[in-house]
């Protein structure tokens, strides 16, 4: 499974390798399961109702309510539709992921089941709203967007915090309650950055995440700027989260998405709101990775790097 994890996300594999062993295993498995459900939800060559049914069935397998062999055949159909061989290999090996889940301690297993249940709920909503790519559909309200970012990403901050305090005695200088709140905001901020970054591509596929009620009363540039400001506020909560971690290795693994997110916000701020997809160049990601390794040694240095990356 290590080889599969490395193949589907080299950057995530690199950062996760820095985590202490008690955190590495449940985080790795949760990532693989979430990546698999995301792949199922996004397999456009399979009709949305079939994707929705299979996603729900697999969620029941994760929850321990259904045997894996009852959905092995539909999953093979999904695997066959993957153009990316690494995604295909992941789907083909989900039985091993479920076996791995069964071998974990009960607390970690229950937390993985809980966070995957929340993530799948968000993915189901996405399929129900945007299942037909020939029809352009928008989220209606800011509450719907806030809910979506929590379901598919904010909940991960809660999951990460529970694992940290359970396995690492001195996980953070803040209380579990404070860290949970910051962690949820961090996850929501990362997802909001993705939405703003991918807005043009999503619109071409019939998905509009910026609230229709806001677009009806303000120019798109203003709505975009407002949500970009919210993303910056949330990602700043993320760097507060990371700076509160007491172990530099955990700080490094946790902070990298915030640092790349900070640079993405700077690029989005400078771009036209209707521009094509904005992405931090690979060379720049490597520079951020190198800089974050040193900056993670000190919370102050980490904050300084973050401020430099997010600056206009």
Where would I find each of the regions flagged by the language model?
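Catalytic cores of Mg2+-dependent Asp-rich isoprenoid enzymes
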Residues: 1-190, 196-312
């Amino acid at each position: 499974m290590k080889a599969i994890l490395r193949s589907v996300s080299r950057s995530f594999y690199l950062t996760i390798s820095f985590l202490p062993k008690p955190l590495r295993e449940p985080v790795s498995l949760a990532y693989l399961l979430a990546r698999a459900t995301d792949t199922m939800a996004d397999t456009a060559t399979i009709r949305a109702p079939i994707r929705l049914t299979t996603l729900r069935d697999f969620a029941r397998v994760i929850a321990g309510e259904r045997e894996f062999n009852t959905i092995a055949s539909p999953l093979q159909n999904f695997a066959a539709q993957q153009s990316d061989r690494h995604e295909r290999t992941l789907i083909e090996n989900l039985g091993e992921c479920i076996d791995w889940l069964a071998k974990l301690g009960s607390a970690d297993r229950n937390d993985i089941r809980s966070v995957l249940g929340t993530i799948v709920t968000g993915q189901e909503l996405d399929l129900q709203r945007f299942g037909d790519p020939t029809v352009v559909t928008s989220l209606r309200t800011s509450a719907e967007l806030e809910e979506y970012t929590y379901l598919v990403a904010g909940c991960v901050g809660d999951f990460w915090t529970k694992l940290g305090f359970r396995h690492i005695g001195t996980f953070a200088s803040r209380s579990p309650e404070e860290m949970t709140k910051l962690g949820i905001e961090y996850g929501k901020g990362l997802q909001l950055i993705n939405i703003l970054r991918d807005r043009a591509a999503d619109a071409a596929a019939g998905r509009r995440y910026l609230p229709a009620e806001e677009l009806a009363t303000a120019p798109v540039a203003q709505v975009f700027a407002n949500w970009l400001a919210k993303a910056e506020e949330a990602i700043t909560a993320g760097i507060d989260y990371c700076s509160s971690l007491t172990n530099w290795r955990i700080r490094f693994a946790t902070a990298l998405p915030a640092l790349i997110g900070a640079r993405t916000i700077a690029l989005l701020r400078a771009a036209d709101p209707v521009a094509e997809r904005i992405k931090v160049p690979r060379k720049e990601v490597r520079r951020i990775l190198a800089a974050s390794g040193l900056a993670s040694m000190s919370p102050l240095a980490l904050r300084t790097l973050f401020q430099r990356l997010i600056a206009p």
